[in-house]
Amino acid sequence: MKAADVRAKSLDQLNDELGTLKKEQFNLRFQKATGQLEKTARVKQVRRDIARIKTIARQKAAESKA
């Protein structure tokens, strides 16, 4: 997910997306532990998407306060 795509979304949409990614991250972690994970690069991609969403959500929250 690109940063521009994330910035275009509202805070509610970002929170929904964050929840979805956290569930996916849990499932990927579980697959890795059981040896069923095929796309190992997806773990890194999901982790970075979560960080990107959290960062932009924080920026939007700060802008709305100011």
Curated annotation (Swiss-Prot):
ATP-binding in keyword set: no
Keywords: Ribonucleoprotein, Ribosomal protein
Gene3D superfamilies found in the cross-reference section: 1.10.287.310
Gene Ontology annotations of biological process type: translation
Pfam families: Ribosomal_L29
Claim: Ribonucleoprotein is one of the keywords in the record: yes
PROSITE patterns linked to this entry: RIBOSOMAL_L29
InterPro entries assigned to the protein according to its UniProt record, in alphabetical order: Ribosomal_protein_uL29, Ribosomal_uL29, Ribosomal_uL29_CS, Ribosomal_uL29_sf
GO CC field: cytosolic large ribosomal subunit
Domain of life per record: Bacteria
Signal peptide span: none
Gene Ontology molecular functions: structural constituent of ribosome
CDD domains listed in its UniProt record: Ribosomal_L29_HIP (cd00427)
HAMAP family per the UniProt record, alphabetical: Ribosomal_uL29
Cross-referenced NCBIfam families: L29
PANTHER family reported in the protein's UniProt record: 60S RIBOSOMAL PROTEIN L35/50S RIBOSOMAL PROTEIN L29, LARGE RIBOSOMAL SUBUNIT PROTEIN UL29C
Membership in a protein family: Belongs to the universal ribosomal protein uL29 family.
Name of this protein: Large ribosomal subunit protein uL29
Organism: Brucella canis (strain ATCC 23365 / NCTC 10854 / RM-666)
Taxonomic path: Bacteria, Pseudomonadati, Pseudomonadota, Alphaproteobacteria, Hyphomicrobiales
